[in-house]
């Protein structure tokens, strides 16, 4: 069978690499892909942009694609799944209406309130004055979010009132995030530990993936601006079996039932970004309608189930008949980024030192890379993800940093403490 994966990041390289392990899969087309997917056995890049819905549909028809997996959020919010359904093509992802869970933060907060799903107290604003009055009344720290999609960067955690006021003015007057910031959500600052809780949903049944923890801030010890993610590890020890059960009962099931009850049944990967507070109460910070990036990379390293079979079961509404199996080892992925990221950065720098042979339990997934005249060059802010398995998070971390050490280009940087919370827990034991 032929498979299509939509996207060009590290997440799509990891999904493609995993899908290629299915013996019945002949070719996995990646649209548009990157230098890593171009080199991966069974994978082939196709020059179609993720926003080109008509082009993707035409290609899937032409190649008789039997499964399409959507990586990024943009095509979901544009309705790629609806278009494939109309053409009678099998695709795993939420419809345009269901993708509002990620596409609009205001929609999500109102949805959570309607279904009594735990989240931070909040208010939505389109005008500057009432928004400023609200933050002055609430005080800092407080969180200001652009309503629409802002590539994971439209969230300002304001530690002072001045920062909050500046963020509101930027988003509502200066329009720092374009269309995404024409409405803001202001919410209480939650204290606790974050976890990424990703599940597969077929409309009613839910299959949990491995837990993970992402590192959003650009700098060590969680300093500097938010990014799309600088590294992740799996499993996340903060999600104990008891908390796992609470998340399923208090967050995931009510979300899936609520979406179905409102006429937007949810099919696809559903990612709940959670804050686990001191007494183990999970609160929803955000939803993503897709697998996380970079969480996908360490999670796929641990996945022992067949990803293609799971996606096909979900499309057939049979997720209750399959199970997910995981390598008991820990996995960690470290993002290698271009100097300047998440602000302006260089493109076109030649990358050297990429591993020539695959070693069990180690993998460099490509994100912002392209082939130029026989060289692999940088083509994005997050360029590569050095990923490794280990018997503990500290062992996985050591292997991943050893792998990262061999790779270089002008201006490359990475965080040096990915996994620090889990490692602190291991050391306490």
UniProtKB/Swiss-Prot annotation:
InterPro entries (UniProt xref): ATP-grasp, ATP_grasp_subdomain_1, PreATP-grasp_dom_sf, PRibGlycinamid_synth_ATP-grasp, PRibGlycinamide_synth, PRibGlycinamide_synth_C-dom, PRibGlycinamide_synth_C_sf, PRibGlycinamide_synth_CS
The keyword Repeat is annotated on this UniProt entry: no
Protein family per UniProt: Belongs to the GARS family.
GO BP annotations, alphabetical order: 'de novo' IMP biosynthetic process; purine nucleobase biosynthetic process
Residue sites binding Mg(2+) per the record: 286, 288
UniProt cross-references to Gene3D superfamilies, sorted A to Z: 3.40.50.20, ATP-grasp fold, A domain, ATP-grasp fold, B domain, Phosphoribosylglycinamide synthetase, C-terminal domain
The protein, known as: Phosphoribosylamine--glycine ligase
The keyword Metal-binding is assigned to this record: yes
Ranges of compositional bias, category Basic and acidic residues: 213-223
Region (Disordered): 212-234
Pathway named in the protein's UniProt entry: Purine metabolism; IMP biosynthesis via de novo pathway; N(1)-(5-phospho-D-ribosyl)glycinamide from 5-phospho-alpha-D-ribose 1-diphosphate: step 2/2
Reaction(s) the record says it catalyses: 5-phospho-beta-D-ribosylamine + glycine + ATP = N(1)-(5-phospho-beta-D-ribosyl)glycinamide + ADP + phosphate + H(+)
Lineage: Bacteria, Pseudomonadati, Pseudomonadota, Gammaproteobacteria, Vibrionales
Entries under SMART domains matching the protein: GARS_A (SM01209), GARS_C (SM01210)
Required cofactor(s): Mg(2+); Mn(2+)
Positions of ATP binding: 135-196
Tree of life domain: Bacteria
Residue ranges annotated for the ATP-grasp domain, each copy included: 109-316
EC annotation from Swiss-Prot or TrEMBL: 6.3.4.13
HAMAP family: GARS
Co-factor binding comment: Binds 1 Mg(2+) or Mn(2+) ion per subunit.
Molecular function GO terms recorded: ATP binding; metal ion binding; phosphoribosylamine-glycine ligase activity
Xref: Pfam families: GARS_A, GARS_C, GARS_N
Record gene name: purD
EC primary class: ligase
Alphabetized UniProt keyword annotations: ATP-binding, Ligase, Magnesium, Manganese, Metal-binding, Nucleotide-binding, Purine biosynthesis
């Amino acid at each position: 069978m032929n498979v299509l994966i939509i996207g060009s990041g590290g997440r799509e390289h990891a999904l493609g690499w995993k899908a290629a392990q299915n013996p019945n899969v002949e070719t996995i087309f990646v649209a548009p892909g990157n230098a890593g997917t171009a080199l991966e056995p069974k994978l082939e890049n196709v020059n179609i942009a993720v926003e080109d819905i008509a082009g993707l549909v035409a290609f899937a028809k032409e190649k008789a694609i039997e499964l399409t997996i959507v990586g990024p959020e943009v095509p979901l919010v544009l309705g790629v799944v609806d278009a494939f359904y109309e053409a009678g093509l099998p695709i795993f992802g939420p419809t345009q209406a269901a993708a509002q869970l990620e596409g609009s933060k205001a929609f999500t907060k109102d949805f959570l309130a309607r279904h009594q799903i735990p989240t931070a107290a909040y208010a939505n604003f389109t005008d500057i004055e009432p928004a400023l009055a609200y933050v002055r009344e609430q005080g800092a720290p407080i969180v200001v979010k652009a309503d629409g999609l802002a590539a994971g960067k439209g969230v300002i955690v304001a530690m002072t009132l001045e920062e909050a006021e500046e963020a509101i003015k930027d988003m509502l007057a200066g329009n720092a995030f374009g269309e995404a910031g024409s409405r803001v959500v202001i919410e209480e600052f939650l204290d606790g530990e974050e976890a990424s809780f990703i599940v597969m949903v077929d409309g009613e049944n839910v299959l949990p993936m491995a837990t993970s923890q992402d590192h959003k801030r650009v700098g060590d010890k969680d300093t500097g601006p938010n990014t799309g993610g600088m590294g992740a590890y799996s499993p996340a020890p903060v999600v104990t079996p008891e908390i796992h059960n609470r998340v399923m009962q208090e967050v995931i099931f009510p979300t899936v039932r609520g979406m179905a009850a409102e006429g937007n049944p949810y099919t696809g990967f559903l990612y709940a970004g959670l804050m686990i507070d001191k007494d183990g109460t999970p609160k929803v910070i955000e939803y993503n309608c897709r697998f996380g990036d970079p969480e996908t990379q360490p999670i796929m390293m641990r996945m022992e189930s067949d990803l293609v079979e799971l996606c096909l079961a979900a499309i057939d509404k049979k997720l209750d008949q399959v199970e997910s199996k995981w390598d008991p080892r820990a996995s960690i992925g470290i993002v290698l980024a271009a100097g300047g990221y998440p602000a302006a950065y260089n493109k076109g720098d030649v990358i050297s030192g990429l591993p020539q042979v695959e070693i069990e339990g180690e993998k460099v997934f490509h994100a912002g890379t392209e082939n130029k005249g026989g060289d692999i060059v940088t083509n994005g802010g997050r360029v590569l993800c050095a990923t490794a398995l280990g018997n503990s998070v500290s062992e996985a971390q050591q292997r991943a940093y050893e792998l990262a050490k061999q790779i270089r280009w002008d201006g490359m940087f990475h965080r040096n403490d990915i996994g620090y919370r889990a490692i602190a827990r291991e050391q306490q034991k």
